[in-house]
Amino acid sequence: MSPNNQNEYEIIDATPSTSVSSDSNRYPFANEPTDALQNMNYKDYLKMSGGENPELFGNPETFISSSTIQTGIGIVGRILGALGVPFASQIASFYSFIVGQLWPSKSVDIWGEIMERVEELVDQKIEKYVKDKALAELKGLGNALDVYQQSLEDWLENRNDARTRSVVSNQFIALDLNFVSSIPSFAVSGHEVLLLAVYAQAVNLHLLLLRDASIFGEEWGFTPGEISRFYNRQVQLTAEYSDYCVKWYKIGLDKLKGTTSKSWLNYHQFRREMTLLVLDLVALFPNYDTHMYPIETTAQLTRDVYTDPIAFNIVTSTGFCNPWSTHSGILFYEVENNVIRPPHLFDILSSVEINTSRGGITLNNDAYINYWSGHTLKYRRTADSTVTYTANYGRITSEKNSFALEDRDIFEINSTVANLANYYQKAYGVPGSWFHMVKRGTSSTTAYLYSKTHTALQGCTQVYESSDEIPLDRTVPVAESYSHRLSHITSHSFSKNGSAYYGSFPVFVWTHTSADLNNTIYSDKITQIPAVKGDMLYLGGSVVQGPGFTGGDILKRTNPSILGTFAVTVNGSLSQRYRVRIRYASTTDFEFTLYLGDTIEKNRFNKTMDNGASLTYETFKFASFITDFQFRETQDKILLSMGDFSSGQEVYIDRIEFIPVDETYEAEQDLEAAKKAVNALFTNTKDGLRPGVTDYEVNQAANLVECLSDDLYPNEKRLLFDAVREAKRLSGARNLLQDPDFQEINGENGWAASTGIEIVEGDAVFKGRYLRLPGAREIDTETYPTYLYQKVEEGVLKPYTRYRLRGFVGSSQGLEIYTIRHQTNRIVKNVPDDLLPDVSPVNSDGSINRCSEQKYVNSRLEGENRSGDAHEFSLPIDIGELDYNENAGIWVGFKITDPEGYATLGNLELVEEGPLSGDALERLQREEQQWKIQMTRRREETDRRYMASKQAVDRLYADYQDQQLNPDVEITDLTAAQDLIQSIPYVYNEMFPEIPGMNYTKFTELTDRLQQAWNLYDQRNAIPNGDFRNGLSNWNATPGVEVQQINHTSVLVIPNWDEQVSQQFTVQPNQRYVLRVTARKEGVGNGYVSIRDGGNQSETLTFSASDYDTNGVYNDQTGYITKTVTFIPYTDQMWIEISETEGTFYIESVELIVDVE
């Protein structure tokens, strides 16, 4: 059904953004759907376009029922709307709501459902007596809470009535004691994880109850001491309950870690459901403190919640399709690393561009699936629309479909998944997704439809509804029904078992709608802004995973400097004054500074924890700034800095809280500065750029022109803009680099790059797009450098000319810059982040003052020398004689090999500097002669290695078409040829292994031929995996047997007499075969390789340590001997057994091949 039982959806144009034809139906943007669609909901449409089987709707892997999760989400949402000290009537209605949610009726057992679902998820049963006891206690608590709620309502109707006051106060005390006695029943040893969701809901109610003592205690007649004791218990239990929930959540999650995709799915679902039912509640616990929050309070949850991967995952008898999570080759850590985002600043999705690929399956040319194979996201930070970030996932193709969110939230996604499968191959993909959107603050809905065609069987398709996992309340208008908005989309692509199964699936990431998109600060409420909702994090600061009770990630800094900036929106009068406090944890005392324009607030914050201690509830404390302040603008920006502590100490920031407390001379100077900057770009004749002018300087001049007053100097601004636009055109025309503005990374032309590089727009340092390069990735024991490169072809170069690579580095650590031709030029840049002032100058509307900022930047650059820490860089490369056949061209590259490294860079250009002459020309000519001599040597070396490798490969084949292997070829011949091929030099570039070298073509030619030989070798051997390259696959082996890598060869090792290896396989009866075994025996005793058929015919080859004295073929280098025996089986089934009597038996290969003699 459509959300809120409505079909009034706008359908946004689903046309691809390229000219590539699409199999999808196309819809115009319209307020009313077409006649053919106006009565059709998304399920009907998906069935029409994708052949959906209506019996397969829903997600069978959803462990926690939608109604149960809706209960948890509803309770959290209701609490978020009643934080601080709410009106008394709100408290009474809140308890009524809670009772209705957790104890809806005698026929509906929410608590039992929670227990059963968690039992299923962790594959463990709650013992009967424990469950019965817990359910009995919960029933009693529900009854008591219902009575208390009714008594509270009675008293609130007449607060002066002594009898109702006495009743409610007595029932408060009785209910508190009920909780104290009942809660241990939800924390039974051995059942902590199973009962965790029940425990969290129960202790949440207890803390809310204790809050009532602070709100109503005085009116009920409690003494100040009694009220204080209730309050102190509440504070103490808040810490105790919080730490308990986080501890057992982590223990439960850790127990679900595994190695397979199936174990990952269980782990993933537990994480999601426990976040919604447990951790979201825990994050709200401290807000019940009426001393800290005596007025209405806004809190926010910034954690990410991931729905299940959108991939076919049901067991069906239809065709050959299988659930994706049952494939053993898809590993736990692969999926986790690909689909779960690392800790990050809170971001807001702006647009989605989906890339489509066409897949097929082996031996069926008519079968196909057009599916979602990758996507590009654009997103921004909170309250900041000036900087756009881009993230690419999966495969980027030419067929694209895109849509922008603008002022809308995606609140539900319904997707069709398909498994195109036959006996030989399985393809997984998403051919359709329906994105349901609502205009923020209204119930006006639109929808975007991504739809592609496929030929998968009906029973091999499935519909995923995000509302199965993050439910919607269909009983209220859309604006009130959704609790989460789509914030990101990750993905995982896989190709396993030689592409026997392959595919790609997106994973939708959601954030809670309590996370305000504008960082709104209210004049009549306490406003909490999580630290991850900053718009910029300065270098050295990091986002780290939250401890579990903060509702999201937190910020960390280990050295004194600026932490970051926060854009805010003030809702109320600018005359209102505020006091600020910070929730933090720290291993050291430090000074915290807040900057707001000219206002600077400082305070000394104390250490809260010891070095090496874990982050617990008690390690986080609040500290306030003493003086209050006013905001200057409705849209304002705050900068936070930490100082006066030793590097290596740790400071964590959870959130910032704002508590409301009862033009002509400068314009002329700006014009003169802009004129000077623009004039400096051109030659005296104004028809070309001045030599040495960089693209960065052109952009910065444009910034100065942009800041000129439209009112005072409209004509001057127009003329200067025309001039700077011409300068930009000239700058682009001379640049030999493709895609210097970073429109696309890893596209068909231009830049090739490693993963993780971000394209960023609109930064204060860079006017246009620039790149953010992360440090090298560490995976297991391997380090994978971050790299970016492109080639400038020989055809665009001039002979005997100097070119120069230039660019601008905002900041960097360990950035290596290369130009490569016959030789490699390299520089390393370690550039401090010191261009901008600590507090950015702003205009009256709160935006960054580019003119003032440019003056600061210029002053910094003017005093900068050309050392390794300079922001600008320039790297020359001289071109001599051109060789279009060799096409060496110029390779431009950037690399970071240190995991701690980073860089931001832009305005990259490769420009012609001028012809070479004099000493420079003579030096280049000498270098070229030396290069030619060196190349002659390299070619001679290459020819020797190549001819030896080619001859070795040629000897493997009996024909010139490489279709038949020589009958006497053994595995040693293949490995010898492989070693020769690997010895071919200059296959890849020395600095960038991703760049092909001079012998890449020869190397790949021989590698492909060798692979063909391996394939033929495997095909002719009647014994599967006879060379043990696939370990013990196909073999039956006792536990002590293993396959070892010895001299780059897979060798079966039988270490003891009681170990054995065997296999049953199929042959052609009455066909003459030769059993050929290459093996080596160590120590006393014999090794045996025996074969037999179903007619009890058998042959045995015996190996001993003294085989070098007997017949057989002996390899002096390896110590292995090859023995053969002829065998004619009578049956089609044969058996082989390998064993030994003593010592160790090494078997390199076992072959049973047709005797061609």
UniProtKB/Swiss-Prot annotation:
Signal peptide residue numbers: none
Region (Disordered): 1-29
A biological process from GO: sporulation resulting in formation of a cellular spore
Keyword Ribonucleoprotein recorded: no
Note: Toxic segment of the protein is located in the N-terminus.
Function according to Swiss-Prot or TrEMBL: Promotes colloidosmotic lysis by binding to the midgut epithelial cells of Coleoptera.
Protein name from the UniProt record: Pesticidal crystal protein Cry8Aa
Gene name, Swiss-Prot/TrEMBL: cry8Aa
